[in-house]
Amino acid sequence: NEASHSRGKYKPNVIGKFVKSMKAMLRYAYENNYTTNDDFKRREFKVYKENVETVYLTEKELNSLYKLELNENDSCVRDSFIVSSYTGLRYSDIARLQQKHLDFEHKLLTIVTQKTNTLVVIPMHPKVEAIFRKYGYQPPKVQSNQSTNRVLKRLCRKAGITNFVSIVETSGGIKHEVTYEKCDMITSHTARRSFATNAYRAGIPSLSIMQITGHSTETSFMKYIRISKEENAIALSKHTFFQANV
């Protein structure tokens, strides 16, 4: 239970993965008559899950990354990330992109996404089109997710994306405030959040963005929007409510 885990250093989502795997194994054993024990169905045998605080890259930060002079290997990683940041596609779909998905005449990208098996049609951003043309009218080669995440952190540091970000993490059942350099929080999935957040901030309607990201509800979509408390406060300060004369 949660009390016993509080003595350790595991984070809730790590514990959740352990429990989820264990429940799957026990369910298989039960359904295939290896055991009659069905305790895994009990309510207290739950999967732990915590909403993890994540970041996104602003368009200014993406531009800094885009302008870096890099070797061929690093360029492929950077360019794949930029494509994801302006299409909202998951890493798994970026890895599947082929020339047949690209329509340069109408500047559209069309693909059936792997996770949700949904057809999405995405306008081709000028940066995305430039990247495809750079690689001979096709997508850049994609590395393994683990390698990509490692390289991205280094490239974001090189691009000067090093401002400090404070978040709250749970470890050993205790919440702590932890500070990271932003570059160290970047993963391939940051690109998808960056697309959703930047499009939302640009005033594109949520439902239009959801047609691209594949979110079925606005509630699940809003979890992708990563506007910091400082950005929110600055936006609010421009509202007439905060502009009243004393």
Regions found by a protein language model. Name each.
Residues 161-163, 238-246:
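C-terminal secondary-structure termini that scaffold catalytic or DNA-interacting sites
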Residues 1-53, 67-68:
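N-terminal core-binding DNA-recognition domain of tyrosine recombinases/integrases
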Residues 137-142, 153-211:
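Short, basic (Lys/Arg/His-rich) helix/loop patches that form interaction surfaces
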Residues 49-76, 86-89:
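Long, amphipathic, Lys/Arg-enriched alpha-helical "connector/arm" segment
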Residues 87, 96-132:
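Conserved tyrosine-mediated DNA breakage-rejoining catalytic core shared by Y-recombinases
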Residues 27-37, 84-106:
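Short, charged phosphate-coordinating catalytic segments
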Residues 56, 113-117, 213-238:
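Catalytic-site neighborhood detector that most strongly recognizes the C-terminal catalytic loop/helix
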Residues 101-108, 185, 201-224:
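Short, polar N-cap/turn motifs at the start of nucleic acid-interacting alpha helices
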